[in-house]
Amino acid sequence: MSLAAYCVICCRRIGSFAPRSKSRTPWRNIRNIIRFTGSLIVGGSLFITYEVLALKKSLMLDTQVVEREKMKSYIYVHKAPVDRLDNRGIVWQARKELHRAVRKLLAAAAKVLRSPFADSFSTVDIEDHDCAVWLLLRKSREDDLAARLQAVREMSEAHHWHDYQYRIIAQACDPRTLIGLARSKESDLRFFLPPPPLPSLKEDSSTEEELRHLLASLPQTELDECLQYFTSLALSESSQSLAAQKGGLWCFGGNGLPYAESFGKVPSATVEMFCLEAIVKHSEIPSHCDHIEAGGGLQLLQRLYQLHKDCPKVQRNVMRIIGNMALNEHLHPAIVHSGWVSLMAEALKSSHIMEASHAARTLANLDRETVGEKYQDGVYVLHPQCRTSQPIKADVLFIHGLMGAAFKTWRQHDSQRALTESAVVDEDRYTTCWPKTWLAKDCPSLRIISVEYDTSLSDWRARCPMERKSIAFRSNELLSKLRAAGVGDRPMIWISHSMGGLLVKKMLLEASKKPELNALINNTRGIIFYSVPHHGSRLAEYSVNIRYLLFPSLEVKELSKDSPALKTLQDDFLEFAKDKNFQVLNFVETQPTFIGSMIKLHVVPVESADLGIGDLIPVDVNHLNICKPKTKDAFLYQRTLQFICETLARDLEN
């Protein structure tokens, strides 16, 4: 700059000189002009070149910075000296609170003005981020439970950290903190490291063979008939064993007929499903869970889970096994170290209610910090599925009926699905589980539980032909599972469909005989029956008429009008309910139901659905749709919601 200024001054001087006499030579002036002009051009060129290079340097991105950031994201080198941070004074605390208040104010202003909240305001903090991260980690290891929960809550609310700070937490936190983050609704998935690499399969092996090997290694003695059936079915339905059986009537000279061979081939996926169903049954036995873990089952199941992302049934069975294993607290370290918490945290955020509910059950069984109950196989919490500060004041239990399930029985009416197929599906317009979507929003202080058990109309369609479970047997089995889940400790309402209502009645009668279950009786505030055959079902009558063709199951036989067990159950329940202070609401269908493609039957007539206690409301639907409201504003849902709110009004206020 000084050189350019000097050139300008010289030019001005030349321009201000008076004309010289003709006696002096003009060449000297020309030489001076050329000298000054050259200096000006050279100096200006150097200045412009310098500015261009400086600007280019400032605009270039140093890729080494990105590489260093990547390394820091996965590996932390040293631990921050948190001891000295405890001595920070009130000035630091004041600055921290002031900055937090300003950040919240900016976020609120951005929301009001509908403009994006600049990341620079959220990532730039007065305090040292790394020190804050290590302070939270230290707080999460304190002996005080409240302090640990507060630390996890603060971690889950952090959404503007750098990637490496989430990785520091992921690598340095203890298992209970990791589980707490997985059960926190707002947790960032960057808190969870990918599962460790799976061991390679043995040479010339497959997942099918590994599954069969794991199943064969489990104890085969002292098993009930159904578990023996599932195990033998899975071990026999292998491609190798069927290939060895291709002889016989369809084989001549050792060469099987081509079409006969096609009959014997079982797809690998089918064999895997047989094995998984057998392992599910084994995982209900605590001692067998130890054998599954020792045999590398956690890694093998994870391989199946990753391979069958497009098969929800496989994934649900895998999660059922992990959820059953999580009931055993001594297996928690193995489950955490194998990477299942990361997978469950991701599944919990799924938009598919069934997948999220299976993950919620597994994580709840792992979380011993905030959950005292244990959710056994077939018991699913629909709400709340995450840690919450909302106090839970009452329970609502959903019990399905014949051929039902914990989720599909309580879906919205199928006619509404077609209306939303071409549009973006809004959960308020269609839901696959209205207790989870609608009731949880309308009554957030309720714990909503749905249970599942196997049923069949015919022994031909039974999953286990040897299974002969009466209503009395199933009610005792369900009652034991519900007590393990803490049912009876709070005020509660039972909601049942079809045979599920008979199970509710039997469970209450059984509980009344046991002094330790008095709390369950006293806390029962109400029961809703959706088309429950208190006096028998016409389905049972029809099944008896064609019993040699249909082979009705034991459950169906017990629903006949002349069933002594059904009449005794009705009489005993009416006697039991005389001095009990709970409300009853009965719904009943008025339309017949198609059973198969040819049979049309009024499954539960009005006279059979009349318990003799409470209101009886006929609804113009069939037996399957009596518990499936068309919309959130439909009479079925609104009347159910009204009953719940009125029955639990005093408990919800408290």
From Swiss-Prot:
Protein name per Swiss-Prot or TrEMBL? Protein SERAC1
Q: Main localization of the protein?
A: mitochondrion
Parts of the chain that traverse the membrane: 32-54
Function, please? Answer: Facilitates the transport of serine from the cytosol to the mitochondria by interacting with and stabilizing Sideroflexin-1 (SFXN1), a mitochondrial serine transporter, playing a fundamental role in the one-carbon cycle responsible for the synthesis of nucleotides needed for mitochondrial DNA replication. Plays an important role in the phosphatidylglycerol (PG) remodeling that is essential for both mitochondrial function and intracellular cholesterol trafficking.
Q: Which UniProt keywords apply?
A: Endoplasmic reticulum, Lipid biosynthesis, Lipid metabolism, Membrane, Mitochondrion, Phospholipid biosynthesis, Phospholipid metabolism, Transmembrane, Transmembrane helix
Report, as the record phrases it, the tissue specificity of this protein. Testis. Higher expression at both mRNA and protein levels in brain and skeletal muscles, than in other organs.
Localization, UniProt: Mitochondrion membrane; Endoplasmic reticulum; Mitochondrion
Q: Does the keyword Lipid biosynthesis apply?
A: yes
Record gene name = Serac1
What protein family is recorded? Belongs to the SERAC1 family.
Kindly list the GO CC terms recorded for this protein: endoplasmic reticulum membrane; extracellular matrix; mitochondria-associated endoplasmic reticulum membrane contact site; mitochondrial outer membrane
